[in-house]
Curated annotation (Swiss-Prot):
List of residues binding ATP: G583, I584, T585, N586, A587, G588, K589, S590
BP GO annotations: DNA replication; viral DNA genome replication
General function of this protein: Multifunctional protein which displays endonuclease and helicase activities required for initiating and directing viral DNA replication. Also plays a role in viral packaging and transactivation of several promoters. Binds site-specifically to 2-3 approximate tandem copies within the origins of replication (Ori), unwinds this hairpin region and nicks one DNA strand thereby initiating the rolling circle replication (RCR).
Residue stretches making up the SF3 helicase domain: 553-708
Compositionally biased intervals (Basic and acidic residues): 786-805
Protein name: Initiator protein NS1
Catalytic activity as recorded in UniProt: ATP + H2O = ADP + phosphate + H(+)
Cofactor(s) this protein cannot do without: Mg(2+)
Length: 805
């Protein structure tokens, strides 16, 4: 499939191979050239010489032959010549012809220099026919028939893509998706790809040239003609975004491109208004590069009188790392710009860090929440800040983010090219909004409700508010007044509804967790606040020891008690749905349950609710319930049996229809037996549905004749060494985790297990075991320190006694 041209050039033999079986060599004198002047489509490349290499005469020089009229039927390597008038009688070859035309086609016969090889006698899998045969004649005349291109559409498209890759490799393509490039870069790329002639003059109709002063988008046509279009046509086009490579060369190319772009922009006429946007490609100044597609810009407004005067000094004394943000000073207020995740999940936390860094007051926090919004178009936002006047611009943060650096670069470019007529220094700032025109008239209604909901919800989550009264007690008056100024008197109705929704959401999450998972969460959040490695943690250990001591004094196995709490919470057994703590006054019943169930958040129902006709109206939808001193009578004993068994019952709700109460884990604290007022038969049925623990000793309170009577005179235990908190009960629970679940497995054999009970996941089990190991090590270290301290004290006392003797 290879043709050879033989020519004589000044007495020297020169030959040249054609890279294609049907076209002439390249006019550039390069036999391997693939430029667009030689090859118009990819189909011709199929005929290109690739694998087969028969060599060339020794001493030959590559070049163009002088004699083009020489017969093409002469072959440099063949001693025979095919007559030009010969005609093929048939296009088919029989089996007999093949045997005759391909005789003795072995490695040894075709390549004598390999006659001594080990495989020289093997038949060739592919060989040329014997010279002069019909097969040889057909091969010479019709060798390219099966390689003719079909000129299909995909061949043209493939060639166009190949030329695109050569002209504009990925490292020089813009990252903003519009395929923008400077014409100077076009010239460099065209010269690199071997295109010798491209018109350097600008056309009169579009005004685009190659003088390096205009940024434009580029389209590559099928005939490989480069057309430059203005930004008016490119803006908003949805072209494919080409990702830039991360090689050092690409980084240098990006820097070079950015410097060229900035230089080109500065060369524009100073009378052109930046706001028109005809000379800036969208995305270049919007900060939409590949590096920050996953991030977004956010902004809010903060008046200076809503910040403390000495906030700069306070910021220098903070131990935490300063957040990264930019401030645009507009006199009495500042506009703050920062970057966060595009989904907005982390933006609220970053905003809170910034307001704390600026020492914002309660009114300032409310203002930041109200004016908080997402910046979709960075260039428009900066033009907005410039239009209403700029006093100073500052960037803060120990580590300046790349997105903020890009924003500052954009600000510098826009500020230097600003139109003085657009700057209104004495104008008051309007609230910055980015929205479609059809939504502008609806803003007052929809956005106001959305902003108020977001503000209240953020505050509820921050302060962990679960009731409307907690909102009144915890939230600062300045914050509530600021909300009333913005949204009026309907704030209270929003608060009540949002609090109810948030409480229901939390209850649904707690319902799906075991007590072990809740205890581990407490450790993850609170343990580091109460335990400091290398320091004196004896107070923490003393409270834990006191809890174990209290159970021991009441003759209650603490592991058994904790195991049954883990059974009741996930509804593990059928027909057992309640736990009762019975004991004398001040025995520590409520102390234990309040700290053990602090994160379970049960609905608390006191005794006075028994006189109400709606005493169970809090239970529909509740995750758990805690009764204090309930009164079980023959009238309501049936309801209590169903409740303690875990059956679904219906209850009356004020101004509503009856609502069902699903199975709800129940805890009860009482000073007298709960079955005192019911029949003996009812008593046994109730006791089958509960787990009962009796506390016999009271915690020492105060030495007073009115509080200490004969009943508890000899049944006192010491007061705790400190305030008992949920973290202490969590440590006691997790420290005995394996023993608790070992006991639960034993109890499973004696009870009917509920198939719908909540199960402990393997991940939570592994985390609890890790915590148990860590707590045991800490306990051992503290005990060792305590023993060493006691030994030292004993030695000192013995030394004193020896000295006195």
């Amino acid at each position: 499939s290879t043709e050879y041209i033989r020519g004589i050039n000044e007495g020297r033999v020169s030959s040249m191979e054609s890279v294609c079986s049907e076209h002439s060599p390249c006019e550039h004198g390069n036999i391997e050239c693939e430029c667009i002047f030689c090859w118009e489509h990819d189909a011709q490349c199929k005929s290109r010489r690739r694998e087969l290499d028969l060599g060339e005469p020794t001493g030959s020089e590559r070049g163009m032959a002088n004699n083009y009229e020489q017969s093409r039927n002469e072959d440099l390597y063949c001693t025979e010549t095919v007559p030009s008038s010969a005609a093929l009688q048939a296009n088919t070859i029989t089996e007999r012809d093949i045997r005759e035309d391909f005789t003795d086609q072995t490695v040894d016969n075709i390549y004598p220099q390999l006659h001594s090889g080990s495989r020289a006698s093997e038949q060739l899998e592919f060989a040329f026919p014997t010279i002069g045969t019909r097969s040889w004649e057909i091969l010479i005349r019709q060798s390219y028939e099966h390689l003719k291109p079909d000129y299909k559409e995909e061949d043209f498209q493939s060639h166009i893509r190949r030329v695109r890759r050569q002209l504009f490799p990925e490292k020089t393509m813009d990252n903003n998706g519009s395929q923008a490039s400077t014409t100077q870069m076009l010239r460099d790329d065209i010269e690199r790809c071997g295109i010798e002639s491209i018109a350097d003059s600008a056309s009169e109709d579009n005004g685009d040239g190659v003088d390096g002063t205009c940024i434009s988008t580029v389209d590559i046509q099928g005939n490989c003609i480069v057309n430059a279009h203005g930004n008016e046509q490119a803006t908003g086009s949805k072209t494919r975004k080409i990702r830039a490579t991360t090689t050092p060369e690409s980084s240098e190319s990006k820097k070079h491109k950015g410097s060229n772009n900035q230089q080109n922009i500065q060369e524009q006429s100073s009378t052109t208004a930046i706001a028109d946007g005809h000379d800036i490609v969208d995305g270049e100044l919007d900060g939409r590069s590949e590096s920050n597609r996953e991030t977004a810009y956010y902004t809010f407004v903060l008046h200076k009188n809503n910040c403390k005067e000495d906030w700069r000094y306070i910021a220098t004394t903070r131990a935490k790392q300063a957040p990264s943000f930019i401030t645009f000073d507009h006199g009495d207020h500042i506009h703050i710009l920062f970057s966060s995740s595009n989904t907005g999940g982390n933006s609220t936390r970053v905003r809170t860090r910034i307001t704390k860094f600026l020492s914002a007051t309660s009114a300032g926090n409310a203002e930041a929440t109200i004016t908080f919004s997402k910046v979709k178009f960075l260039r428009n936002y900066i033009l907005y800040c410039i239009r209403y006047g700029i006093e100073t611009v500052n960037i803060y943060g120990n580590k300046i983010q790349q997105q903020l650096t890009e924003a500052m670069d954009t600000f510098k470019v826009l500020f230097e090219n600003r139109d003085p007529n657009d700057v209104i220094l004495d104008a008051g700032c309007k609230l910055y909004h980015e929205e479609k025109k059809e939504y502008q008239q609806k803003r007052c209604g929809q956005r106001k409700q959305q902003n108020l909901t977001d503000i209240i919800l953020d505050k509820i989550k921050e302060k962990k508010i679960t009731t409307a009264q907690q909102w009144e007690n915890i939230i600062e008056p300045e914050f509530k007044i600021q909300l009333m100024k913005e949204f009026g008197l309907n704030v209270d109705s929003y608060v009540q509804r949002i609090v109810r929704i948030e409480r229901t959401r939390i209850q649904q999450i707690i319902k799906s967790k075991t007590l072990t998972e809740i205890m581990v969460e407490i450790l993850n959040e609170e343990y580091i606040k109460n335990f400091t490695p290398g320091e004196d943690n004896s107070k923490l250990q003393n409270i834990i020891q006191w809890i174990e001591y209290m159970f021991k004094e009441n003759n209650i196995n603490i592991i058994h008690f904790l195991a049954w709490n883990e059974i009741i919470k996930p509804k593990r057994y059928k027909k057992i749905n309640g736990m009762v703590l019975e004991g004398i006054t001040n025995a520590g019943k409520s102390l234990i349950l309040d700290n053990l169930l602090a994160m379970v958040k049960p609905e608390e129902i006191p005794r006075e609710r028994d006189n109400s006709g709606f005493h169970l109206d809090q239970l529909p939808g509740a995750g758990s319930v805690l009764f204090e001193e309930p009164m079980i009578t023959p009238v309501n004993v049936g309801t209590w049996k169903l409740l303690l068994e875990g059956k679904t019952i219906k209850t009356d709700v004020k101004n509503k229809d009856k609502e069902p109460i699903e199975r709800t884990p129940t805890w009860i604290t009482t000073a007298t037996p709960i079955t005192n007022n019911v029949h003996m038969n009812e008593t046994s049925q109730i006791l089958q549905r509960i787990k009962l623990y009796i506390f016999k000793k009271s915690i020492q309170h105060r030495e007073d004749k009115y509080t200490i009577n004969a009943q508890i005179q000899n049944k006192l235990i010491s007061r705790p060494p400190g305030l008992v908190e949920p973290i202490h009960m969590a440590i006691v629970f997790v420290k005995n985790f394996k023993e608790i679940y070992k006991l639960i497995e034993e109890e499973d054999n004696a009870h009917t297990v509920n198939e719908k009970a909540i199960r402990l996941s393997e991940e939570a089990k592994q985390e609890a075991e890790e915590w148990q190991t860590a707590l045991q090590w800490n306990t051992m270290e503290e005990e060792q320190k305590e023993n060493e301290k006691q030994t030292e004290d004993q030695d000192k006392e013995s030394e004193k006694e020896t000295a006195t003797q």
